[in-house]
C-alpha cells in the first residue's frame, strides 16, 4: 500500500473447518508450508474462525484445535485468530494463550457505541469495524490513542453499502460450515445479478484508498488496515 509499509499479518480461511465463518474456505497448501512462508517474511498468521453459531460440543474439533496448536507453538512470531463467538474466544484464551484475538467484522456492529464497547474489551488485540463505520470521522477522531491502535479497517469491502441482511448472510455460511443442509444466501443487493466482484470495491462509499490512508487515517492516528480477497 505504502512505500514505507509492510504486511504485518495475513489471515486465512482454512478449508473444511467447522469454526470457520464469513466465507466458505478452500485451499491447497499445507499448514506447515504456509507457516514456513510466514516465518520467512516475519509475518503474523491469523486463522479466520468467525463462525457465529458455535456450541460447546464444537470446541473439541480435532482439525481446528490442531491448527490453533500449530500457530500457538510458533516461537518466532505471535499469531492470531479472528473470532466472532465468545465461546470460542474464551476457549482459545484458555488453551492457546500465545494467540492474540481479533474481533471479526462479521459481528456487523453498525452502531458506533456497540463498536466502541467492542474496542474497549481487553480480550481483543484488534477490532475490525463494519465497513459502514469506516468514514464516521467525527466519532473516530475522538478515540484515544490506545483505542485507535486496536482498530483495523477493511479497505475494500464489496458488499452493498445499504445491505440490511448482512448478519443473515454470515449466519448461513456459519451453518454450512457446521455441515447443516441449508440453501445459499440470496443476496439483496440491487446489482446482485453481477455477482461478488472486487472490481466494485472502489465504487463503495466505504472504500479506503492509499491516498485516504496517507492523508486522512494516518494523520488521525490509525495504522491498521486489511485487504479482502488477497
Q: What residue spans do the PLM features occupy?
A:
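Short, hydrophobic beta-strand segments that form beta-sheet elements in well-ordered domains
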Residues: 1, 80-84, 127-129
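Single conserved hydrophobic/aromatic residue that forms the stacking wall/gate
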Residues: 1-7, 11
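A structural motif corresponding to the C-terminal end of an alpha-helix
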Residues: 33-46, 73-79, 212-224
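Short, well-structured secondary-structure segments
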Residues: 9-63
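N-terminal active-site wall of soluble small-molecule enzyme domains
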Residues: 43, 48, 52-78, 83-119
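Alpha-helix-loop-beta-strand connector modules within alpha/beta enzyme cores
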Residues: 26-43, 92-98, 145-155
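Catalytic alpha/beta core domains of metabolic enzymes, predominantly
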Residues: 100-230
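Well-ordered, non-membrane alpha-helical segments in soluble/globular domains
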Residues: 22-35, 61-71, 136-140, 203-213
